[in-house]
Amino acid sequence: MHDYQQKFIEFAIQRNVLRFGEFTLKSGRTSPYFFNAGLFNTGNDLLELSKAYAAAIARSGLDYDIIFGPAYKGIPLATVTAMALATDGNSKPFAFNRKEKKDHGEGGNIVGAPLQGKVLIVDDVITAGTAIRESIDIIRAAGAEPAGVLIALDRQEKGNGELSAIQEVEKEFGIPVVSIIRLEQVLDYLKSNPEFAGHAENVASYRDRYGV
């Protein structure tokens, strides 16, 4: 595990973004953990989050020209990631979409830089992949191509079939999905910290049952 990944896990736990217990998911499954990136809701939270996204991009080696944040959650994520990259001397344009088109002023449903070249999509998680598919449609309609997807957490969990939602996106569009952390790293962290020993066992059992 890299330093930025351990720091991100610790910070997510501290901010109650990553919690352990018993949670009923939309899928109906009972999960021993829950990740809610919406609780990164202060300026400092976004600062720390942006550093983790920038570190994940640097490690991934992804080749891209512009950052895109799907409305709504992806908008602040793309914005702060672009800022963190600029701090590291890697300034990239960014854009996001509106849910509704405007018929006055700045027209269209894209705000920010024009979508062109290779586009990196930044979001919090991929659950069903719907937002990512919509983003790819928007990107291609603008004449650009998706370069990959960057998310905070890869649950490494099967969907309805044998593949995870992330694997389905990778297979369908032929693009990589990069995450700051994966469930296996969360599990490693839990195992290495005695205070989380009980949670480690529950997460490991869940991963054995639903993992990919």
UniProtKB/Swiss-Prot annotation:
Alphabetically ordered keywords of this record: Glycosyltransferase, Magnesium, Pyrimidine biosynthesis, Transferase
Catalytic activity as recorded in UniProt: orotidine 5'-phosphate + diphosphate = orotate + 5-phospho-alpha-D-ribose 1-diphosphate
Gene Ontology terms: cellular component: cytoplasm
Single GO BP term: 'de novo' UMP biosynthetic process
Binding sites annotated in the UniProt record for orotate: F34, F35, T127, R155
Amino acids binding 5-phospho-alpha-D-ribose 1-diphosphate: 26, 72-73, 98-99, 102, 104, 123-131
EC number(s) reported in the record: 2.4.2.10
Signal peptide: none
Cofactor: Mg(2+)
Domain of life: Bacteria
Pathway participation: Pyrimidine metabolism; UMP biosynthesis via de novo pathway; UMP from orotate: step 1/2
GO molecular function, one term: magnesium ion binding
Record InterPro entries: OPRT (IPR023031), Or_phspho_trans_dom (IPR004467), PRibTrfase_dom (IPR000836), PRTase-like (IPR029057)
Oligomer status and interactors: Homodimer.
Family the UniProt entry places it in: Belongs to the purine/pyrimidine phosphoribosyltransferase family. PyrE subfamily.
Primary role: Catalyzes the transfer of a ribosyl phosphate group from 5-phosphoribose 1-diphosphate to orotate, leading to the formation of orotidine monophosphate (OMP).
Name the record gives this protein: Orotate phosphoribosyltransferase
